[in-house]
């Protein structure tokens, strides 16, 4: 029954994603509070509401009269409030954990039954992990609330890589090279970041361990090596652009720089590779027809074709949804740039930003529900997050010196989740 319920909820999500169903999935919440205003569980409650409403998938519903029991009568009240699901949280006697149950109000089945620790130093993380679990239950992919985002900042004595939690907390610097670093890209397991770094007259490819800070130059052949993209199904394979053979082409190599393979061979500039989630295809930017446009090829370099027939004058920064159903890219809009989304066949281009400064470098969240990008809409370059359909835009940074974001893989939550029954 749980599997059947999960399949039904995923159908609802797909309908919302495709535009055939309107609105968000209503969730009623009770519990997750304490009369002690200093209790960390109150922060869990507030964060939970923010995460659900900011997910692009859920919408919390107003609490009806207090419900004393989980029965048909109480479920009817929640249904009347517009909720499709009811989430209850019971604080443990010690206050150090919360027992959670998620009810399907249509079937009255418990679809999630789990216990989560509450870390008093970061109680919000409990809510992040819970919502990520709910998103996986509904969509098949873990949510992005507990994940991190790497980006470039110009405010640290150079262009350095920084990492920030997806909620804007815990910003910290990763590189201290005092040079120009660009295009950070996370490895599939989330422990390494590949990036391009200026070393003298050469642009090298580096891989850094985010735990130790140890960095390795993997492009010992010199020249211009940029825009690394880690293969989503192989933690030992990286696509990148290089002029090592005289012209900017797309290549792949192992994570230590060996086994270099050339994929494109054309007298044009080919850059910015991006893998499909199954690693069967790669999208990239090329000016082979005179203007920089987005192309798609098989991951072995065959069947190169333009993504869309739309008469754009400039396209850049393709990024494939982890669900495989959409490709983000940047389109020139007069003197500025905006972010669009189309299917992998190039159909139904939808503009997600329009008329609010320049908007570039879009990257999908690991659940395919949100997008991080940089924009000048507030002056300078700052990071913003929006929902997959362009709604709910909110700032992540505000320093005016942040760009080139990359969303990390989803966090497992195993350090917070004590037990789970589905």
What are these regions (language model features)?
Residues 143-145, 188-189, 232-234, 277-278, ...:
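Residue-level detector of Asp-centered blade-edge/turn motifs that repeat once per structural unit
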């Amino acid at each position: 029954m749980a599997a059947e319920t999960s399949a039904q909820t995923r159908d609802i999500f797909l309908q919302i994603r495709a535009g055939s169903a309107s609105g968000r999935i209503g969730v009623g919440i009770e519990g997750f509070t304490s009369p002690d205003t200093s209790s960390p569980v109150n922060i869990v409650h507030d964060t939970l509401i923010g995460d659900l409403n900011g997910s692009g998938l859920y919408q919390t519903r107003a609490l009806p009269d207090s419900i004393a029991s989980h029965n048909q009568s109480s479920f009817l009240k929640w249904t009347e409030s517009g909720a499709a699901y009811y989430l209850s949280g019971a604080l443990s006697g010690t206050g150090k954990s919360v027992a959670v149950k998620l009810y399907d109000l249509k079937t009255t089945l418990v679809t999630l039954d789990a216990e989560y620790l509450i870390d008093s130093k970061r109680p919000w993380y409990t809510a992040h992990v819970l919502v990520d679990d709910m998103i996986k239950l509904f969509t098949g992919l873990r949510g992005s609330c507990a994940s991190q985002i790497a980006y470039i900042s110009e405010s640290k004595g150079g262009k350095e890589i920084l990492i920030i939690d997806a909620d804007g907390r815990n910003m910290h610097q990763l590189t201290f090279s005092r040079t120009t670093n660009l295009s950070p890209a996370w490895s599939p397991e989330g422990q390494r970041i590949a990036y391009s770094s200026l070393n003298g007259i050469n642009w090298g490819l580096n891989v850094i361990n985010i735990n130790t800070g140890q960095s390795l130059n993997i492009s010992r052949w010199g020249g211009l090596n940029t825009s690394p993209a880690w293969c989503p199904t192989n933690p030992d394979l990286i696509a990148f652009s290089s002029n090592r053979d005289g012209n900017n082409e797309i290549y792949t190599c192992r994570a230590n720089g060996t086994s270099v393979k050339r994929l494109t061979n054309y007298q044009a500039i080919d850059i910015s590779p991006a893998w499909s989630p199954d690693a069967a295809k790669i999208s990239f930017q090329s000016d082979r027809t005179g203007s920089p446009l987005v192309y798609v090829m098989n991951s072995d370099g065959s069947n190169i074709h333009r993504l869309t027939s739309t008469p754009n004058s400039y396209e850049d920064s393709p990024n494939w949804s982890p669900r495989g159903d959409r490709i983000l890219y940047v389109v020139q809009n007069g003197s500025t740039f905006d972010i669009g989304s189309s299917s992998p066949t190039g159909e139904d281009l939808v503009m997600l930003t329009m008329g609010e400064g320049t908007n570039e470098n879009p990257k999908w969240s690991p659940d395919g529900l949100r997008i991080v990008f940089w924009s000048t809409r507030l002056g300078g370059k700052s990071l913003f997050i929006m929902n997959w359909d362009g709604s709910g835009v909110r700032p992540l940074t505000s320093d005016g010196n942040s760009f080139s974001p990359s969303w990390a893989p989803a966090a497992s939550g195993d350090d917070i989740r004590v037990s789970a029954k589905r």
